[in-house]
């Protein structure tokens, strides 16, 4: 995996509340009863806990907030759906974002992407010593997702991007 200039490890903040993707209607439909890998899912298991309510089993992969041993086990698994929630927006390099997307696409035939839009200006900036924010609207990621996930059909449903292997 490509080294990121900003790890944005400190942006793992949802200790009490599950990320929004775990309650978005179309995302819930895609995850119900399925095995899910959450790429960059952070140090907390709030998403996995929320997904249990609709029969999804979630494994979190996060090179900055989980141990190498944990991540190895997760990467060895087989999944129906990959989630990338509020991860692409904290990576300052398109090449590194593409690596995250390609990893997700290699692990599952369905990839669900959400981003935090920040101030929505589209002007990325450093937000802390080791953190970055792209400040881009969800729609602005579509072409990037399409480029990274060749062979996937990519659509946007509001603040959710859904990529399905053709």
Locate each region found by the language model:
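Class I (Rossmann-like) S-adenosyl-L-methionine-dependent methyltransferase catalytic domain
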Residues: 1-75, 110-166
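Catalytic P-loop NTPase motifs of RecA-like helicase/translocase cores
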Residues: 67, 90-91
């Amino acid at each position: 995996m490509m080294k990121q200039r900003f790890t944005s490890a400190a942006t793992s903040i949802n200790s009490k509340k599950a990320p929004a993707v775990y309650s978005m209607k179309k995302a819930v439909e895609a995850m119900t009863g399925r095995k899910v890998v959450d790429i960059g899912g952070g140090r907390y298991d709030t998403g996995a806990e929320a997904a249990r309510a609709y029969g999804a089993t979630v494994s979190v992969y996060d090179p900055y907030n989980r141990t190498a041993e944990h991540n190895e086990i997760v990467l060895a698994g087989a999944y129906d759906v990959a989630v990338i929630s509020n991860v692409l927006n904290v990576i300052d390099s398109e090449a590194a974002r593409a690596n995250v997307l390609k990893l997700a696409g290699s692990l599952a035939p369905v990839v669900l992407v959400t981003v935090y839009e920040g101030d929505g200006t589209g002007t990325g900036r450093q937000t802390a010593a080791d953190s970055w924010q792209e400040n881009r609207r969800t729609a602005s990621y579509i072409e990037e997702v399409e480029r990274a996930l060749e062979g996937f059909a990519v659509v946007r449903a509001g603040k959710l991007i859904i990529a399905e292997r053709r």
